[in-house]
Structures are given as C-alpha cells and as structure tokens.
C-alpha cells in the first residue's frame, strides 16, 4: 500500500530517508504538533511580548532577537585599564599613581587640554587648602567628581596634603564643559563646585 500524497511530500521536503512507517509516524507527529498548539505557545513563557508599533531599545538580557551591529557591540565592550581610551572615558584605574604606567602626567607629552585640566585641578586644590585648611593630615581636600554636561564622569584626583595633584588626568573633549567637585576626604562634605572649559 502506498503512503498518502501528503506523507510522501513531507518525506521528500524534509529529506527523511526510511521506511513508509517512519514517514507516516513523522507526519502524524507534525500534524499533531501543529493542531494541538496555538501559534504563540511555541514561545517560552518568559519571552516578552513586543509592541511592533513603536521602536524599542535593544536589551540583550531580556529581548530575544537579532543582535545589534558590530560597531554598537564594540562600543558596549568593557575597556581594560591598559586600554588607551580608558582614562579618556573618565574612569581612573585603581593604583594609577604618579609613577604608574597607567597614569599620564602633564609633563609627559600630554595634550594641551589635559595639561590645562591638570593645572586647573591643582589650582583648585590649592585654593581649597588656603581658604579652608584641613584640621588634620588625614583630613584633606580631594576632587571627588568630574562630570560632562552630557555624561557624568568620576575622577579621583586626590591630594594627600593639598600641595600637588596626582598626575592622573582626564582628557576632556574640546569645547565640552566639565565640572569639578571637591570635598573633604573624611567627612565627604562638598566644599565647592567649579566649571572648567577644556
């Protein structure tokens, strides 16, 4: 006895070799699966429903679907402390002191904006130490925050005795205003906030 036409079509379209009994069994399983399950039940229960009427931001942790372009993925990668753009993004690696290879000082061929930023930070700390001297050697002023107008950034340009600034600097983009915020190291009380244009 020959298999029905739809079973033969299924066998040839899926490329399943074998006896007619296996083909019929496979066809019955496919038909049962298509008949018993509604269209949306094949999705996992935790998959979010998407409103196709409005654009949505990509979130790889929640959204199943296509990955963003490679250029976007490259921008989302975490930079390592030895990466040249690490300091330029506003993150100061831990342990980057004056003699560290990760620090970039004003006298080591740094760009003009970095040199100006370094001098402004140094003058800012000297001004703080002269107008509001710390009560003890452990209580010193330090710059706790540096922020762009569009993206907040943090720098730890700390000074133990308010006489000179650590040589770790940021490289602000030209024409983008920055804001320096200083506070006492022990009390975290904000002393002053000064704008700086790179």
From Swiss-Prot:
Residues 40-111 are annotated as: Disordered. It comes from the Eukaryota. Residues 60-74 have a biased composition (Low complexity). This is Putative uncharacterized protein encoded by LINC00336. It comes from Homo sapiens.
């Amino acid at each position: 006895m020959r298999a029905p036409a739809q079973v033969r079509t299924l066998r040839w379209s899926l490329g399943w070799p074998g006896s007619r009994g296996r083909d019929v069994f496979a066809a019955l399983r496919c038909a049962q699966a298509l008949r018993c399950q509604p269209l949306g039940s094949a999705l996992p229960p935790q998959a979010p429903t998407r409103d196709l009427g409005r654009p949505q931001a990509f979130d790889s942790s929640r959204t199943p679907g296509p990955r963003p372009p490679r250029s976007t993925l490259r921008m989302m990668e975490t930079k390592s402390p030895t990466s040249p753009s690490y300091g330029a993004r506003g993150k100061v690696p831990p342990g980057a002191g004056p003699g560290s290879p990760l620090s970039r000082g004003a006298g080591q061929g740094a760009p003009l904006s970095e040199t100006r930023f370094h001098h402004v930070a140094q003058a800012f700390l000297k001004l703080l130490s002269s107008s509001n001297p710390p009560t003890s050697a452990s209580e010193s002023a330090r710059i706790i925050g540096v922020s762009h107008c569009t993206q907040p950034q943090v720098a730890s340009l700390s000074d133990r005795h308010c006489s000179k600034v650590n040589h770790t600097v940021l490289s602000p983009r030209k024409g983008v205003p920055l804001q320096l915020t200083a506070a006492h190291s022990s009390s975290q009380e904000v002393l002053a906030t000064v704008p700086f244009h790179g």
